[in-house]
Amino acid sequence: LAVPEQLFHYPLLILDPAENGEFKVGSNGTGAFTLVENEVGRRQVLKAHKPGYWGGGPNLDQLEFIDLGDDPAAAVSALASRQVDGLYGADIVQLDALQKIPHVQMYQVPTAYTATARVQPVKPFDDKRVRQAMRYAIDANTILQIAHRGLGQVGEHHHVSAVHPEYAKLAPFTRDVARAKRLLAEAGHPGGIDVEIACRPQPGWELLAVQAMVEQWKEAGIRVKINVMPSTQYWEVWTKVPFGFTTWAHRPLGVMSLALAYRSGGPWNESRYSNPEFDRLLTQAEGTLDVNSRREIMARLETILQDDGPIVQPVWRAIFTFQDKRVLGFKVHPSLYISGHQLAVQS
């Protein structure tokens, strides 16, 4: 079912066998451009195939991607001064400044891009009542407004988005602090719990979301210390920390996200979640072509994760970015793919 989508997805870069698995300057490919310069951490330059590209175009002679670093203000300044024609992606902390630039246009699209506060099966998280309490203690809509200015959709703690074709709409999952406190007491924590969450400082919306959740958890007796780690350091330990806030990119099918993140023993199963009934239903869903039949199975999978799962999921992001109004043919893709062969720049 997911094979065509997997072939199109960003982790599956298909290389020419003659190049021994190395992607480098001059590598052979099927795209409209060839990589001619590659300075890691600085820039890439791609030169157009003219003529003869099978997909139409390209209209530009070359594309240049520039790494402006982690400072959000640097990208805003570069776009405002027309040092660059557009941004690959924009962060919520840049939004106000970018909207004030008169010569740029905003593009956005709803996606299955998210981040989850996930736990591993160590105390106190090994008791599902604690995990349930963490979910009931938050108001996802408030966090969406604080962390992402309402650009997106509320999360429902099951990692299946309304943009997925097999999404099953469950009853709204609403905040209930009294229930969260009761669940903690039943789990042996009448005075609450003290834990630490690891997260990244960038993109800024992730830290904003964590800070908002921490304030809400506090009301239920869930006291959380925030350990902000540089992104490079976080990705070294993202599958090891007991409690972390991890970003997950858009996947076009819900079964793809669930298989990557929650199937027992999976290499990206950072929470180490293992539920035989969940695995059985997921395998069944992956083999069900009819979307309505698959949606019925997905409803059961979503319910399992809301009840037993290892995540608190506050938001689904809308992806947005800004381009100079001179840029023609640009469309924002949920996976942030850039169709360079469709682009042009008005002289």
Residue ranges and their predicted role:
Residues 94-97, 122-163, 208-209, 305-310:
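Periplasmic-binding protein-like
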Residues 321-347:
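Long beta-strand-rich cores associated with HINT superfamily self-processing modules
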Residues 129-132, 220-234, 259-325, 347:
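Extracytoplasmic/peripheral linker and loop segments enriched in polar/acidic and small residues
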Residues 21, 51-97, 214, 223-225:
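Ligand-site clamp/hinge motif
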Residues 40, 164, 181, 185-250, ...:
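Ligand/substrate-recognition segments at binding pockets and active sites
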